[in-house]
Amino acid sequence: MTDTAENQTQNNWQAEHPRSIRSFVLRQSHMTAAQQRAIDTLWDSFGIDYQATPADLDANFGSNRPKILEIGFGMGTATAEIARRLPETDFLAIDVHGPGVGNLLKLINENHLENIRVMRHDAVEVIENMLQDGSLDGIHIFFPDPWHKKRHHKRRLIQAPFIAKLLPKLKTGGYIHLATDWEEYARQMLEVLSSFDSLQNTAADYAPTPDYRPETKFEARGKRLGHGVWDLVFKRMG
């Protein structure tokens, strides 16, 4: 796919999926030949097409292992590493960025990973229309765009209405794991999650980084800039 074709695909996607305020932008980035080849050859095995009807995740994965939703995986490096570290857990990874989708599929193939399925779609629509209540054992959202300008804060993904959409999909005892390198956003995340009676913080405030989460490029970048990194892990109690 050429840059022009990729950009046209993104423009078509935006036209077909209008929403007043989005937490992401469709970056017009170059799709490498290897990334496009991965999409062309591996999507049928590891990709899931969006449908506006409830999905059977066990059927999609061919297993009844625990299911983790990962929203916004970037280039997929951390996602592939987490899946490698947790082979008895299935990961549904969602992003709208074409090169990232292609790269994650490439990593799945190179690392012989059977426990990842990939979607290229708006996560909000997937949550609303495809995921059944009580179908998830965990949710990972690592380094979402902080939209640091105050006038853009309304675009931040982690807000109460979004968490309210997620909670019914999470099993009792399931968890939400967030991470950010933006301190003010970390405070907002803590405030939002703490506002739900059905969620219990696993730490006094911010959690130690779990062993399964590798350092991402965003985390490394933040550390180089002198930023801290904050993990939050909350469990659903009921």
Swiss-Prot record:
GO terms for cellular component: tRNA methyltransferase complex. The active site is at 145. It comes from Neisseria meningitidis serogroup C / serotype 2a (strain ATCC 700532 / DSM 15464 / FAM18). Its EC number is 2.1.1.33. Signal peptide: none annotated. Catalyzes the formation of N(7)-methylguanine at position 46 (m7G46) in tRNA. CDD domains: AdoMet_MTases (cd02440). S-adenosyl-L-methionine binds at residues 70, 95, 122, 145. Belongs to the class I-like SAM-binding methyltransferase superfamily. TrmB family. It holds the Pfam family Methyltransf_4. The gene is trmB. Keywords: Methyltransferase, S-adenosyl-L-methionine, Transferase, tRNA processing. InterPro entries: SAM-dependent_MTases_sf, tRNA_(Gua-N-7)_MeTrfase_Trmb, tRNA_methyltr_TrmB_bact. NCBIfam families: tRNA (guanosine(46)-N7)-methyltransferase TrmB. PROSITE patterns: SAM_MT_TRMB. Substrate binds at residues 149, 181, 216-219. Gene3D superfamilies: Vaccinia Virus protein VP39. Pathway: tRNA modification; N(7)-methylguanine-tRNA biosynthesis. One of its GO terms (molecular function) is tRNA (guanine(46)-N7)-methyltransferase activity. It catalyses: guanosine(46) in tRNA + S-adenosyl-L-methionine = N(7)-methylguanosine(46) in tRNA + S-adenosyl-L-homocysteine. This is tRNA (guanine-N(7)-)-methyltransferase.
